[in-house]
């Protein structure tokens, strides 16, 4: 049987399910096998805090969307009473959030998750070994195994499936570059303002813009699917970053 054991995940999913209306959620006794085929991956392929200021935690108390995670971080206080931040930006001094690798969070907003497709369905598709059907433990990108990872559900040619993915990822890459350029432009303008004598107090609101914009751009950059796990959600997040 599949089991999840990581304390951070068990606490995180408990908070998430409580927000959704289910108290004392235990995935090992309450999740379906199909859900567990994602949860075993979500023990690590997620956003989390792991540093010297607090015990490792997953920020899912308000939900899995980028702004819901941000809301929790903004409300979180370290033991010294200071609000959450991963580091102070060297050039501007803004207190920013560093995304880890939020694959589970972005995937949860996509069509595959909504359709009940688990991580293992694509990254560990079933294979036959004699008369037995087992998951392929050669874990890799579905693009390296399109026939078994994709074509069991999508009845198109392998080349067409690869083209579809390429279009999605190319569009995301361009939008991601635009978002990151916008963040860099903002950082340079803050640096110029400080050079001209702007005080920390005068730049408080601008620091918040950097925190929000950089968090969103980094969320998609760090997520590792180049937007594929949830293309529309990735585009929304990057558009907010640019804005």
Which residues are covered by each model-predicted region?
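Primarily the internal scaffold of c-type cytochrome electron-transfer domains
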Residues: 1-121, 125-243
């Amino acid at each position: 049987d599949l089991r999840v054991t990581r304390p951070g995940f068990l606490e995180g999913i408990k908070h998430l399910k409580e927000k959704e209306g289910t108290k004392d959620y235990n995935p090992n006794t309450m999740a379906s096998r199909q859900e567990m085929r994602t949860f075993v991956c979500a023990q690590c392929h997620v956003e989390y805090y792991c540093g010297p200021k607090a015990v490792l935690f997953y920020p899912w108390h308000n939900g899995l969307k980028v702004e819901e995670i941000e809301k929790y971080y903004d409300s979180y206080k370290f033991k010294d009473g200071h609000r959450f931040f991963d580091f102070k930006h060297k050039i501007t001094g803004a207190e920013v959030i560093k995304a880890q690798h939020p694959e589970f969070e972005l995937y949860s907003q996509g069509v595959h998750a909504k359709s009940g497709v688990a991580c293992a369905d694509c990254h560990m598709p079933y294979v036959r070994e004699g008369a037995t059907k087992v998951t392929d433990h050669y874990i890799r990108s579905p693009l390296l195994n399109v026939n078994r990872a994709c074509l069991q559900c999508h009845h198109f040619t392998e080349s067409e499936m690869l083209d579809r993915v390429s279009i999605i990822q190319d569009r995301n890459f361009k939008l991601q570059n635009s978002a990151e350029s916008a963040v860099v432009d903002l950082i340079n303008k803050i640096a110029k303002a400080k050079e001209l004598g702007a005080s920390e107090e005068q730049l408080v609101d601008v620091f918040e813009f950097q925190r929000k914009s950089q968090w969103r751009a980094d969320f998609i950059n760090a997520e590792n699917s180049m937007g594929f796990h949830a293309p529309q959600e990735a585009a929304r997040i990057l558009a907010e970053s640019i804005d």
